[in-house]
């Protein structure tokens, strides 16, 4: 499990409990700059560092687990997962899962702001900006939202370098989606207010039959933490059983 921007692996305990009845164990990491891992909060020098982290983590899990390892990436972690798969470094992996991959933002970013971020990525790469995530949009369960807000390991930072690296990686993964040679499942909430589900639909359309897209009616950004999450866990288990 590779988490999204500003969060950490501990937020996936609900996911782990949901998949356990299907005989599946969950392993998760904190990307550098997140959770208990070292590094400036919300910063990465290059997208390749997160790809390195993911490849090393998958290899570690393969050394621990007795069965098939199926990587899953959520939101920003979904883009990292796509980059890692396309890099060819996830040896022995046959398929993977994406949850609300952050390919397109729901709120359009003005062109001037994107250009400014690219410039600042070169001039002041560690400049910390607010990631502008509205906690009320992560899911529809008040207790989960409250826990997200009060979680000391959740942060609201994104550096100018990370923003520029993410934008480049998201565009690159969409452009080269036809080259993905592994089967994968895409989960996207129809009412996601952070990430535009149109990005998932475009990815699916470009993958030449390698992906299965499941649009989750009424779900917000975090389907594993939202209402009726048991249905999502069952859908993943069903896909894995094919």
Predicted regions, residues:
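Active-site nucleophile elbow and catalytic-triad environment of alpha/beta-hydrolase enzymes
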Residues: 158-176
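The conserved beta1-alpha1 loop
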Residues: 2-4, 74, 188-189
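Short alpha-helix in the alpha/beta-hydrolase fold that links the catalytic acid
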Residues: 182, 196-205
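Conserved hydrolase catalytic core segment
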Residues: 68-70, 75-96, 104
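Catalytic nucleophile-loop/oxyanion-hole region of alpha/beta-hydrolase
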Residues: 6-9, 35-65
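Conserved alpha/beta-hydrolase
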Residues: 11, 16-40
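Short beta-strand/loop motif that positions the catalytic acidic residue
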Residues: 180, 186-188, 192
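Catalytic active-site module of serine/aspartate enzymes centered on a nucleophile-bearing elbow/loop
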Residues: 210-242
């Amino acid at each position: 499990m590779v988490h999204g921007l500003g969060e950490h692996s501990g937020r996936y305990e609900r996911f782990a409990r949901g998949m356990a009845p299907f005989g599946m164990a969950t392993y998760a990491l904190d990307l550098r700059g997140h959770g208990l891992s070292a590094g400036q909060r919300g910063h990465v020098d290059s997208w390749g560092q997160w790809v390195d982290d993911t490849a090393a983590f998958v290899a570690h899990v393969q050394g621990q687990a007795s069965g098939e390892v199926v990587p899953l990436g959520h939101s920003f972690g979904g883009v990292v997962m796509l980059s890692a798969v396309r890099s060819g470094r996830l040896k022995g992996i046959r398929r993977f899962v994406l949850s609300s991959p952050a390919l397109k933002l729901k709120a359009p970013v003005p062109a001037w702001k994107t250009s400014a971020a690219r410039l600042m990525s070169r001039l002041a790469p560690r400049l910390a900006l607010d990631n502008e995530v509205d906690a009320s949009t992560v899911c529809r369960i008040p207790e989960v939202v409250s826990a997200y807000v009060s979680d000391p390991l959740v942060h609201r930072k994104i550096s100018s370098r990370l923003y520029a690296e993410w934008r480049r990686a998201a565009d690159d993964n969409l452009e080269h989606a036809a080259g993905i040679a592994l089967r994968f499942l895409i989960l996207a909430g129809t009412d996601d207010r952070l990430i535009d589900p149109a990005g998932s639909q475009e990815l699916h359309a470009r993958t030449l039959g390698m992906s299965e897209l499941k649009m989750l009616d009424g779900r917000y950004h975090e389907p594993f933490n939202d209402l009726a999450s048991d249905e999502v866990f069952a859908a993943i288990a069903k896909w894995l059983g094919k």
